[in-house]
Amino acid sequence: MHFKDLGLHDYTLKNLMYENNCCKFYDAVDENNISYVLKFVPSDVTSEGDTFPFVDRFQVKEGVFLVYSSNDFGKEGTDYFTYTGSGGNEVHISGTSSEAGIKPQFIETCHPKHLKRGTKEQEDINSSTSKKSAVINNFSGEKTPNPRPQSSNISERETYVGILNVKCKNKNSSKIRSEKLVSSVIETKHTPGLASILSKEGTTYPNNADGKHISIVNPSSKIYHSSHKQIVKTPIPKSGLSPIERCPFNGQNIKCYSPRPLDHESPQRDFNNNFQLRILKSSVLQRRQSTQNS
C-alpha cells in the first residue's frame, strides 16, 4: 500500500509486524528507502495518547497513522512490543549471569512497621556479613563470595538474591534458645492461686493453712443417668414400732420386735397402728415400683 501526499513523506507499507484489538504496526519505507514503523489506530478506537514520540502523523478515512523512526525501536531490542522497558515489573533473563554479564540483582525489603533498625540490630547485621559464607548463585549454581560485604553500611535495605549456605565449624546440633516474657507471679508459702480463689468466695485464708487440708472434688466423677430420679426416704413413724421382746436363742437373749403390741390398751390404738402400718407398706411398694421402672 502506498500513501502519497498525506504526510511529510511518501510511505510504502512492506509487511504487518504486530496487530491487536486497538492498533496495528507496519514496517514501511519512504521515497528515500528509509525504514519507518507506522502505527495504525482505527477511527472507532479511542486512544489515550501515545507516550512514545513520533516523527510524523497523518489521517486517512479508516483511522490515523503515527510514524516512528526505526532507530528508536532498535535500542529496545528485536522484540519491540513485548519488551517491558524501565517501567516493567518483571524482566526475564536467560542464560547464566557469568555469560551474559548480568550484575547481581537486589530487591528492596522494608523493615516491619517502616521503622529504622536500632543500633543493636544494625551491629548484628554488620557482624553477620563478616562471617565466612558462600552464596550459591541462582543462575550458574557456582559458589561465589558474598558480593559487596560492606554494602550493609551503605544501604540497610538491600538484600542479595540467592541461597545462603553458611558453613558451621561446630558438628553438634545447634540449639536455638528463645526467651519468652512471662508475667511475674508472687511466690508465697501457700498454694499459688488458692488465696485468690478463696478471696473471691469470701473465705478467709489463714496464715497457718496448708494446701493438703483442702480437697477439690471433681464434679465429673458424679455421673447421673438421664432417667435418674431422686428417691426420698420414707420416714418410719416412731409409734409404729412394736415393743422389744427378749427371745432366747442358743442360750442368748436377743432383742426382737413383736408383730403386735404386748399390751392391748384399746381398739382405737390397734386401728391407729394398723393404719400407720398400711401407710408404711404402701410407701415401700411405691419405692419398689419406682426403682423397677427406672
Swiss-Prot record:
It comes from the Eukaryota. Induction: By salt stress. Residues 115-153 are annotated as: Disordered. It is found in: Cytoplasm. Keywords: Cytoplasm, Phosphoprotein, Stress response. The modification Phosphoserine is found at residue 266. It comes from Saccharomyces cerevisiae (strain ATCC 204508 / S288c). One of its GO terms (biological process) is positive regulation of transcription by RNA polymerase II. Residues 125-153 have a biased composition (Polar residues). One of its GO terms (cellular component) is cytoplasm. This is Halotolerance protein HAL1. The gene is HAL1. Involved in salt tolerance.
